Amino acid sequence: MAESPFKADIERAQKELSEKMTPGAIVYIPGSSVINKTGSWRVFKPEFNRDKCVRCYLCYIYCPEPAIYLDEEGYPVFDYDYCKGCGICANECPTKAIEMVREVK
């Protein structure tokens, strides 16, 4: 079978693209929400009950923003500057340690 006359062009294009593109499903930096505080328009906010928490980290895993981090003991801490009040954390919590309450400003 004869070699494609375009093989060199294809290989060069693949090399150029591979140098410019990141591997799939990897986000090296979050979107602009880290730069721009996004919690100012929230209607509900998560209220955390430490006594009910089993440290399963589902709230941390499912939070679509960088709004939850873990303290030294592994408990979630909510960064209200970035929390949009979506309620995903409360919905995913198996022990209902997170309750969404109306934001009072």
From Swiss-Prot:
Cofactor: [4Fe-4S] cluster
Claim: Iron-sulfur is one of the keywords in the record: yes
List of residues binding [4Fe-4S] cluster 1: C53, C56, C59, C93
Domain spans labelled 4Fe-4S ferredoxin-type: 44-73, 74-103
Binding site for [4Fe-4S] cluster 2: C63, C83, C86, C89
Cofactor binding remark: Binds 2 [4Fe-4S] clusters.
Alphabetical keyword list: 4Fe-4S, Electron transport, Iron, Iron-sulfur, Metal-binding, Repeat, Transport
Source superkingdom: Archaea
Any GO MF annotation of the entry: 4 iron, 4 sulfur cluster binding
NCBIfam families membership: PorD_Arch, PorD_KorD, PRK09624.1
Quaternary context: Heterotetramer of one alpha, one beta, one delta and one gamma chain.
Name of the protein in its database record: Pyruvate synthase subunit PorD
Organism, scientific name: Pyrococcus furiosus (strain ATCC 43587 / DSM 3638 / JCM 8422 / Vc1)
